[in-house]
Amino acid sequence: MLRLKLKRSADAELCEPTEQTAMALENLGLVLIDEASMVDSTLLGIALQCAHPFKTRLVFVGDPAQLPPVGEDSSPVFAMQRACAASLEEVVRHQGPVLQLASRLRDGGLPCQNPPVLPPIRDERGHVRCLPQKDWLDHARQALRQASLQDNPDAARILCYTNRTLERLVPLARRAIHGDMADQMAVLPGEVLISRAAVMAPASRDGEETGEEPDMVLGSNREVIVRDVTPESCDLMDFGLSPADGAVPVIETVSAQVSAGELELCLRLQPPVGSDARRALDGVMQRLRQQARDAGQKNGRAIWRRYFLLRDAFASLGPAAVLTVHRSQGSSFGEVFVAPDVFRADQSIRQQLCYVAVSRARTGVWLIGGGASPVIERSWRHAFASTLSAS
């Protein structure tokens, strides 16, 4: 809507105005911005500048208890001094025990620490389960498998805090969904993937004309379904590298035919984490980055161009069955399995992480219980006295 362009700096994705941005809201009287807690300072400033000349009303809708934009301590939308504010009190996404848990985590009524193992907390509107780790994993596998069989991936997801935990859980989730085939192929037809970064034109086998933007074929955080997979040997010399830059490997990866709604793309994928091909690719990227830095601002420009072309030549997609809490914000799922690293996050964002993770669930929340102090256990039993006693 704002006619922005994507600028990629290191591993960050930034929005910048274009020549069309200033007039983007010219004919609009009202613009509604949902999930406003994720609007960063730069995007907020651009939106306000665009709206001012045309007196366009901007209505921001969001929850200040959710996570702020990456790299910011708080959501700038809620710090605006001249805004007219209103609070909505009725929760409609979830009810019952899920709502109770989300509310207690949000207002501090329950500590954001690993819960105790408890009997099922449930009523006719939903449930919360606190189980030993093995039982949690078994139920997660069953739920993911059932969601796949029903062709409803939003029926169950695993949420975690760190990418390290995500990479550890992804193989477990893929085996649950795809069985033995998961260990034979890094990507399978029918698999639901999510873009972990914007996919740029060099990664598209169809060229940039099929994408969502001139240089970007698929935005970040977009889910796609894999239709077909083809092995591909990618010679990095095709991207301007030469033996003068060091060893130039051939990267064994795959091209995936994917669809997202009416959009169909053929993308060259990054090799999976931990594979020989991924280590070789990462090694070349690290070497180019260091060479560019050593060459200085003027002499390093050509090296940086090769670096960015190579980086953009591989799409960063991963299985959508396991998501980080940050990536899940704005979505909702039936059953949510919360990994324990969410409760071990830095204290400054732990409450927001726990609240966002739990509030993604429409029906059920599954937590790993155990090791809680008597004080923590009493807090949980008191908070859910009615639904525990009805179990």
Walk through the language-model features, giving the residues of each.
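C-terminal accessory regions
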Residues: 235-391
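Loop/turn-to-beta-strand initiation segments
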Residues: 27-30, 54-60, 364-366
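Walker B catalytic acidic pair
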Residues: 34-35, 62-64
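Short, conserved "post-DEAD/DEAH" coupling segment immediately C-terminal to helicase motif II
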Residues: 41-56, 74-77
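Short loop/turn elements that form and flank the Walker-type P-loop nucleotide-binding site
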Residues: 25-27, 52-55, 153, 332
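Hydrophobic positions in the central parallel beta-sheet of the AAA+
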Residues: 31, 59-60, 158, 338
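Conserved P-loop NTPase motor core of helicases/translocases
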Residues: 1-49, 111
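Conserved helicase motor core of P-loop NTPases
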Residues: 56, 65-280
